[in-house]
């Protein structure tokens, strides 16, 4: 540990000297000039140290090209060793332990995972292409630091130089708490991986973009236990964070104002790390840091005012979004990312982050194709960057990761997600504006809603989308899961329509919009299914005869206009047949015809009125109730209905004529039997009931009628059941006259007999008289004879 403290003091002293002399000068002019005043000789490995110095003098020409990067290289390796030592201390006894082999294997694993790439043939090559020599003896710590590739420290060196003042101020804090040093670990590892990708002069960014946009399959080379071990290391490392991590990030600049490799006589012209390339690379890294660079700032443009400063609520981790160069490095970077988080848990440490952290790499490459930008500009600490799932990526091991992550989260209480964090990154990428507009509107800066626990989120996801290992993601499922991954409350998701799963629409959902028409799985078949329409069963709740005439929603009309028109015609025909005025079940009285017809028109009109109110599209087809006629699908059906109506009309007329003839025969029979009495000169205000009551004293009356004339004379006919009663009324009827009335006229058979065209011959000698035997004299005369006879009669 004393050796580590000595190296840290030496590094910071050299950085301070470089800041005083100028940033254009090399930060470390020569390795033997390191400040070793505080070095403890007892803890120093003399052979390894001198061997390293001897190798350094032999390779002076190669080392001179990278002296400006050597302090940061040593600083990074010491950080990694301290990180490994801290891991061993925290996992075993939480006591200080000397440096032994426990830390070096993890150091080797991290180094191999971060440096090794699939696109590079020799990862440890120098900028000029000469590989460093390998020694057969046991490599010491300093040898490991010196043998590390030099091009892995380019992006970190200048950032350390620009932030020298902050590191000098906090030197004592770094010395007392070595765990803080690992804050720079994930950042420098990420910078090292990206710097090694950019070997050509103008091609590095294009090749990097090409590699980032390749949507490869989820890695299967690493076993699952590798991820579990990385997750265990992250659990131990995240306990050692302090507040100085945030202060260190606040002192970081957003972009570089000077090139990372200043021109010097030792710098070859053919070096692949030119100014513009390195600036762009570091801009990618710094813009990936959450909240430090505004989303609209170009990668190569320096931002001086730095309006987006880090806050204690923001998470400095951005490692999960920047695509690593290889599948092997992806796991180690993910483990280091979770280890560099603060003690307060955020959404990236939640259960959903464990599920979605593996898919963010492919998602970022997919978004790069949409944005058409030369560099990656995503924020890794925001949920919407991590929650977008690719269609082709379905991780089978998600359930195991969720289970392990839930066990880890039970140790620490999750903290609330700051609403400002969502708003500060809403505009980070234009492709996200459409998908997160509703989420940003619903979350206000002063929102105090209770955040969902991870178990509740997992329960909601399993409820609506099934188990994660068996889920099939589509566009609609991705949007819904994006909402559920944003750590909102239960009330937010309870507003989602529940007819998505059932395929049926609730009341009032199709009143103003037609975008949910695809939810109706069952076609319109005329069945009485109230849940399919925009009117509930309340339409038929008050004894309406048009209960099954509820109109379907507007979307069904737009999808099947012809079929609905045919259904409407057949339905109208059915209604007209059942409510026809010539129904056989109607009463035989003549007045029932008009009442039935008016009832039919009322009911059909009410039905059409309800249909018109519930479905505006029916208004063009509906006519007035009295002018609308039933429609028929075929001419044969029309002929059949017409013949039925004609047949019914003939039968009705026949029955009516038979009734009239029967009444006439009964009247004639009553007249012949002398049971009909004619009563004349009655008052004009006399009613039939009054006349019947007054003459009923003589006997039982079958029929009584009163007729009024225009001249004011009134008369009536009374038909008795028996003839004797009629005679008694004819003889004693005058006794019923009142004082203010005239005498009644009482006759048999009534006056109607006097208006007959054939009268009976009252001559008693009619049988003896034969008109044929009597012949007139004028019958035998012609015209001339008759004329002469007339003239003679005139002379007389």
From Swiss-Prot:
Top-level taxon of origin: Eukaryota
UniProt xrefs under InterPro entries: Nucleotide-bd_a/b_plait_sf, PGC-1, PPARGC1A_RRM, RBD_domain_sf, RRM_dom
Bias-annotated ranges (Low complexity): 578-597
Region annotation Interaction with PPARG: where it falls in the sequence: 291-337
Record PTM Phosphoserine, positions in chain: 538
Quaternary structure and interacting proteins, as annotated: Homooligomer. Interacts with MYBBP1A; inhibits MYBBP1A transcriptional activation. Interacts with PRDM16, LPIN1 and PML. Interacts (via LXXLL motif) with RORA and RORC (via AF-2 motif); activates RORA and RORC transcriptional activation. Interacts with LRPPRC. Interacts with FOXO1. Interacts with NR5A2.
Name recorded for this polypeptide: Peroxisome proliferator-activated receptor gamma coactivator 1-alpha
Organism: Bos taurus
